Regions:
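Gly/Pro-rich loop segments of beta-rich domains
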Residues: 42-78, 107-132, 160-184, 214-238, ...
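Residue-level detector of Asp-centered blade-edge/turn motifs that repeat once per structural unit
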Residues: 82-85, 136-139, 190-193, 244-247, ...
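Conserved beta-propeller blade signature
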Residues: 87-89, 141-143, 195-197, 249-251, ...
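Short loop/turn segments immediately following the C-termini of beta-strands
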Residues: 93-94, 147-148, 201-202, 255-256, ...
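A short loop-to-beta-strand structural motif that recurs across blades of beta-propeller domains
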Residues: 97-101, 107, 150-154, 160, ...
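Blade-level signature of beta-propeller repeat domains, shared across WD40, Kelch, NHL, RCC1
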Residues: 339-377
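Surface-exposed, glycine-biased beta-strand/turn segments
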Residues: 370-465, 472-477, 494, 498-510, ...
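Long, low-complexity serine/threonine/glycine- and acidic-rich segments characteristic of extracellular
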Residues: 500, 506, 542, 557-710
């Protein structure tokens, strides 16, 4: 094993820039000769550049598999660091609890750790608990924010792991080495003098570990807050990443405040970036990773929303663009890079980035596209869960009523009837009953829950989000157990719940209690993208009821409805109209549903037949236009696949109407406009047959045919 030790740097840059540099590699054994190595200059950073996102390591499945890049697996890839030989070090939490290494030759291996625990040692003899951020010093030592152990660990080039500070217990205490205490530290950085700066996440403070091991507090008053002020008077809310420049200025990803903060050498804290108020889709949301370039650019991983934000030295802020997702119409991509849950970022010498995505369970490379280079696959494979799945409410081994499925249109509380797609599965439960974990999982997101006291309150755990519950609280408001920390306001009233990264939950553990929505909503995102939860084999779930078609309507290209036919007569369409839009009013039900229940469909399309039932050429089988296995990430796409007569304006007992714009397409999570090309048909009588199917494969047979005459 070899590492590089810096002995010279041009222009005094903390990250080399501006010219070539001479380094020496350290030998694998004491006394071994060192080899001189010239490195090329760090490339100057391009403002607002366009990237190609390419999978670097991991296949999207959860596990611990070393070996070739594409076959490797991670459990919770979080922090990343690059050494001067091009090795990528990865802090892999979850059930892995390892420091992994990705070599330039394309092989993933384990560098240190291998079990959950708190133990020093060499290689696999060492133990970590949910390692998070990584940082390398100038001597090649790797520092680890060992979140679940409330400690900072040091890995020597030989693979020997020692504890730099912290004693394995949560708390707040300055001191030397193990006499100091942290509370779930997630972020860290090392300056050129060997000082280690720590984002002491759940203490809401920034700490410093001097080269002699002395721990002191740099900034933060110890309470979640949002205050620019000198040093210990400043307020942070769950800081999770930190970076330091060559002048000693610190930059902090202040996750709970959706902000990036700066700490000057004198301790003064200011805010350099945060979203505009009332911005419904900010590019900077829940920042959780930082990386500095040698020429002063700062990259920020927006943990919610998935964007990679570049902040220039002059303060200009841009989301990196994605060459393979150019801006589309109002219903499509905005053109920016959209990962799933980006965390750690590292900058290569050529200016490209390595990003760890905990939700996608992969490492990605972001680089300028090369001429003639093919675009990578746009989707991760869906890893099927084959074992029987318990329900998220009790009794977990008995069937419960499904009251909402993926892909349904949903309205907003302020009157918009087509506000967003329903992204998961709704399971009815009594208000106050407990929501239960369905898979053994650890908390990955440092800020995993949201919406305290609101109807949309929820928490992410493993590949799921559990929503519409009082997170971590009984119906009477008391905390369920010590994994949930109630934070109090100035009147000693609970104002939020804090759940640490690394908290572990077994199947059946209580996560919260049902709020007045009277159901729990589950989003499911194995490998990153939201997937239909009906792919999970829930115990006893049955569907023997085919969908119901309530009506079929046609609209011209201007959106005007074509006059319905008189009873017993075909609907007449002028061939000159060319493009016609098809809207189908339909719904589904499952076994056990109340009579009033309306569920959305899984697959829709249409077929054109001659009057005698023979398929028109090109329509030998139904043309499938919409499949609700994945959903677009752009919220406005809901207005493309649902007609404006869809939805409801408020939640509650009102019936939702699903008016599908069947001539528009929704495939593979991408929505595109379309139409029925009646201009391609010869004049005559036809049958427009709607294909409406549910996830079980049952197809509507009644009300599916609309006789038409093309004139």
């Amino acid at each position: 094993m070899k590492r590089i030790t810096i002995i010279a740097a041009l222009a005094g840059a903390g990250i080399l820039a501006g010219g070539a540099a001479l380094y020496f590699s350290s030998g694998t054994q004491e006394g071994a000769p060192r080899r001189a190595l010239w490195l090329p200059a760090e490339a100057p950073t391009k403002p607002a550049w366009t990237a190609r996102v390419t999978p670097l390591a991991g296949d999207g499945g959860n596990g611990v598999v070393d070996g070739a890049l594409a076959a490797s697996r991670f459990s919770d890839p979080f922090g990343v660091a690059l050494d001067l030989q091009g090795n990528v070090y990865v802090a892999d939490g979850g059930d892995s609890n390892r420091i992994r290494r990705v070599k330039p030759d394309g092989v993933v291996s384990t560098f240190a750790g291998g079990r959950e625990g708190f133990a020093d040692g060499v290689g696999a003899a060492a133990a970590f608990h949910t390692p998070s951020a990584l940082a390398l010093d100038r001597a090649g030592n790797l520092y680890v924010a060992d979140t679940g152990n409330h400690a900072i660990r040091k890995v020597a080039p030989s693979g020997s792991v020692t504890t730099l500070a912290g004693d394995g217990q949560p708390g707040y205490q300055d001191g030397v080495g193990r006499a100091a205490r942290f509370n779930g530290p997630v972020g860290l950085a090392v300056d050129r003098d060997g000082n280690v700066f720590v984002a002491d996440t759940y203490n809401d403070r920034i700490r410093r570990i001097a080269p002699d091991g002395t721990v002191t507090t740099v900034a933060g008053n110890g309470q979640p807050g949002n205050a620019d002020a000198p040093a210990l008077a400043a307020g942070f809310d769950t800081p999770t990443a930190i970076a330091v420049d060559k002048k000693g200025t610190l930059f902090v990803a202040d996750t709970g405040n959706d902000a990036v903060r700066r700490i000057e050498a004198d301790g003064t804290v200011t805010t350099i970036a945060r979203p505009l108020e009332n911005d419904p889709q900010p590019i900077l949301r829940r920042p959780s990773g930082l990386a500095l370039t040698g020429d002063g650019y700062l990259y920020v991983a927006s943990g919610a929303g998935g964007r990679i934000v570049q902040i220039a030295p002059d303060g200009a802020l841009h989301a990196l663009l994605d060459v393979d997702r150019p801006p589309e119409a109002s219903y499509g991509s905005d053109g920016t890079v959209r990962l799933y849950a980006p965390r750690g970022i590292a900058v290569r010498r050529d200016g490209s980035l390595v990003v760890a995505d905990t939700q996608a369970l992969r490492l990605f490379s972001l680089a300028e596209p090369k001429k003639g280079e093919a675009a990578p696959p746009s989707q991760s494979p869906v890893i099927r869960h084959s074992a029987s799945m318990p329900w998220p409410v009790g009794p977990q081994q008995e069937v419960h009523e499904v009251v909402g499925v993926m892909g349904e249109v949903r309205g907003s509380y302020d009157g918009e009837s087509r506000h967003h797609f329903h992204a998961g599965l709704d399971i009815r439960a009594d208000i106050g009953s407990r929501v239960l974990a369905v898979l053994p999982s650890k908390i990955s997101d440092p800020f995993p829950n949201w919406g305290f006291g609101s109807l949309g309150e929820g928490m992410s755990l493993g590949p799921f989000s559990y929503i519409h519950m009082r997170v971590g609280r009984e119906a009477n408001g008391k905390a369920l157990d010590e994994r949930f920390q109630l934070l109090l306001d100035a009147r000693a009233k609970p104002e939020r719940v804090r759940v640490r990264r690394g908290a572990r939950f077994a199947v059946g553990d209580a996560l919260g209690t049902i709020n007045p929505m009277a159901h729990v909503h589950m989003d499911y995102y194995p490998g990153g993208a939201v997937v239909n939860p009906l792919t999970l084999p829930f115990v006893g779930l049955r569907d023997t009821i085919p969908p119901t078609i309530q009506g079929i309507a046609l609209y011209d290209a201007a959106g005007k409805r074509i006059r319905p036919a008189r009873k017993g007569q075909p609907l007449r369409i002028e061939r000159a109209q060319g493009d016609v839009n098809i809207v189908v009013d339909a719904y589904d039900q499952m076994d056990g549903n109340l009579a009033r229940r309306r569920l959305g469909l899984y697959k829709l399309g249409y077929q054109v037949l001659h009057a005698d039932g023979r398929p028109v050429a090109g329509f030998e089988a139904p043309l499938i236009t919409q499949v609700y296995d994945r959903l677009p990430r752009e919220r406005e796409a809901v207005k493309l696949v649902y007609a404006d007569s869809s939805g409801i304006t408020v939640y509650g007992s009102k019936t939702t109407r699903f008016a599908y714009a069947v001539s528009n397409t929704m495939q593979g999570g991408q929505a595109l406009p379309g139409s029925w090309k009646v201009g391609n048909l010869a004049p005559g009588d036809y049958i427009l047959r709607i294909h409406a199917a549910d996830f079980a494969g049952l197809v509507a047979t009644e009300g599916r045919d609309l006789p038409v005459t093309v004139e």
